[in-house]
Amino acid sequence: MRRTFIKKEGVVITTLARYLLGEKCGNRLKTIDELATECRSSVGLTQAALKTLESSGAIRIERRGRNGSYLVEMDNKALLTHVDINNVVCAMPLPYTRLYEGGLKAQFDGIPFYYAHMRGADIRVECLLNGVYDMAVVSRLAAESYLTQKGLCLALELGPHTYVGEHQLICRKGESANVKRVGLDNRSADQKIMTDVFFGDSDVERVDLSYHESLQRIVKGDVDAVIWNVVAENELTMLGLEATPLTDDPRFLQATEAVVLTRVDDYPMQQLLRAVVDKHALLAHQQRVVSGEQEPSY
């Protein structure tokens, strides 16, 4: 009987810890009856689970009688030990640039962490919202368009040039003023937005193509230009192409910044990111990978 109680209390502790991770110090907590209903347990078992969390030092609650109970202190790392996180799966872009091979995994020491590489921010966000993955890496530019929907939280921002170096308009040498057909991979939210920003209402035809074949399609004459993550200049020269910097709009800079999205109600994952990710160490790791000083973590 006692072992059954312990098992049930453990389930309630996990549910309470997930709830508390979404609260802030100073917040009035739900009543014990409300918490018992959410935990699908008795009032007595819920009270016992709450006291266990208090005894462990994860939280401190101030009880003010009829005015309710208030969360006075909380230790996010301690609460996370009570949350059943078996592994973490992060949806990532395809690693065609070494910036994507940086050290996010290295930050999750002791927690099984896996990447799922997928082309197109739309599909990464869709899988995140459907509960297939725990978090997704996209550009800030794409994130801003997704955050107009409900259900997403911007949990981590890494700053400019952490997603890609920069995007430029790639075209045949000397043809930048004669663009009539521009290539566009409709799976790339960034490319769609930047193409619309750059060309505006100009009479330029959008031609659907895969992102990775963009340069060859320009060389063949299928399209005149494409907005693309800049490659080595000597490669463009060999292909008879040139690159024009994208300026005069802050959205072009937003497209270079990596951010991490979670589901808005996944408080444990948001707190886990805040608790374990050292942004300075992450960016330093990323630069070592880019320079070839360190092997990427997969």
Residue ranges and their predicted role:
Residues 1-31:
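Extreme N-terminal segment that seeds HTH/winged-HTH DNA-binding domains in transcriptional regulators
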Residues 97-116, 197-198:
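Short alpha-helix C-terminal cap/hinge motif
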Residues 50-51, 125:
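Short, hydrophobic-biased segments on the C-terminal half of alpha helices
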Residues 83, 106, 111-114, 129-139:
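Intrinsically disordered, low-complexity regulatory regions of nuclear DNA-binding proteins
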Residues 119-122, 129, 134-298:
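C-terminal regulatory/effector modules of DNA-binding transcriptional regulators
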Residues 51-101:
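HTH-adjacent hinge/linker in prokaryotic transcriptional regulators
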Residues 27-39, 53:
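A short alpha-helical element within helix-turn-helix/winged-helix DNA-binding domains
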Residues 40-49:
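Short coil turns linking two alpha-helices in DNA-binding domains
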